[in-house]
Amino acid sequence: MTAPTQSVQDTLDGILAATEAAQRERAQQRTEPALVRLWDGDWNLRGRVSGEIKAEFRWVLNNTGTGTLTLPADHYLAKWAADTNSRGTKNVHITVDKDGARWGGRMSGVSVRKKDNGDREVELRFLDFMEDLKHIRVWANPVLPAAIQFPRAFTLAGPSIWALKLALFLNLMRNQNSLFTLPDNPLDFSQWTGNLNMENWPVSMRGQSLLGDSSPHCVVSSRFKTWHDLAAPILADAQLCVTYEVYLPGDPEPWPGYTPRVGQVIYDIVDKSGWWGSTGTGGNIFQGIARTAMQLLENGVDMDRTVVSDPNSPDFRGNDWLGTAPGAPWVVLREGELTGIQSSEFTYQPATDVQVVVGGHSMPGVNEVISSAIQLAGDLASSTFIGPNVNLGQVADTLLQPLYTDTLLAWMAFKSTRRAQELGWSHYFEYMPSNADRAYTLSSLMAIRRGWWETRERVGHHVKIADGAPYTIGANGRGHFFIGDRIATTHPLVADKLVVEQVTELDLSWDRSSFGWDVTVGSLSRTESGLDQVVRQVSSGVSALQELGVL
């Protein structure tokens, strides 16, 4: 006897039931309030926040996010936070869990206000843990004490993620190593030896394989810069995203066998944009998001992206996977009568100048060659016509020096005919970037590229959307996109045009009557160009050698 086979109708009914169950689960997750908890300076839980008046927490791509929490003055957590002398530690920490994402930060200030009606409220202000990266210096030699810093600068070349992580790790280890500095509590013997174990550090990072890192190469050079300042241009150039996670009780191990202390902040650098590979950068609603690869045109100035064939994206094959793959963005926020966009602001700035001028000082060696030629000619003339003991070359050079100095090979001008044709017959003409006072050098070439980039067209799109209409915001499989992901938005007046940019800011805010997300897509301050990256790497290498005293 054969087993009964499942009919097509039963299969379809099962798929429908599973889909509806998933929809109900996601709807329930979206309506769940955020889990807000306050912790003291040693990461002891002080309480779960409820009954707040309002709250707002912001994620900013590769920069410090801010948070505010307003509580009634009679709230027990408000009294605890405002009474700075009674609590054991001065610092107050906060964690906010919503849709798979965790916002964590440290209190930067507290204010007690009295309103016109006599009510008092306490406002707590926080900075997220991206701020910590602005307080970590990259020493010239992290393994030696401050009195002995040889070589002069910390220099490292390699893939961007690996190089930045190694620079961060060495200086985290320096901060926790008690060989040359006192621990926080010198009387605690365990702090003299236990800090060699990264699980006990307040800040750590995920490891990175050198051979497995395919991010763009860079030159890291620092002489006591902050890690944030050191990393900012490299992160912007490669469109990488710094993330952090705060380990709390009940969380899974960050990686197998690693159990950090409660409250440890773990940093990572990830590529969520796919900018230097092939990714979505534009398109229309009829053909979808076009996948393109960056290409530098023959004139060395203009850039274009070439359309490439759509590859297979294995991440989207699983029916339970939720998110955006870096190489295949797919989320499209459309304007219209029935839309999840509650308000939006689209900003476009056209390109300005069609020619960039740099210079002011002659190329190295030019003034010296002219000076030597004048002195040689003067010496030969005086020896021939006056006598061998008469030397007029130096006199002539001194008199003529104000006339010839910085006149030959002192300026460079480069025009983009393509930009001129795109802008039309009437347009702005010339632009001179800052810090470009010497022509025909690596710095001048870099300044030209920076000039083109500073005057190119810019696109920014700020939207406020209703969560779950139809896309959800969240991380770690709880949302369709999050900070750093590339998503598309429709042009408000050109109905069929798609603008694809990175999510640069996320703002989660609520009060006693509303809840919502603000999304900022794109930025009017753009990253470096392709050739600028190459020149900056060479220039960084030269600067590193100069700091080391080699050049």
Explain the meaning of each model-derived region:
Residues K114-D119, R125-L127, V262-Q264, D268-T281, ...:
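Compact beta-rich and alpha/beta scaffold cores in large eukaryotic transport/transcription complexes
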Residues I136-R317:
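Charged- and aromatic-enriched interaction segments used to assemble
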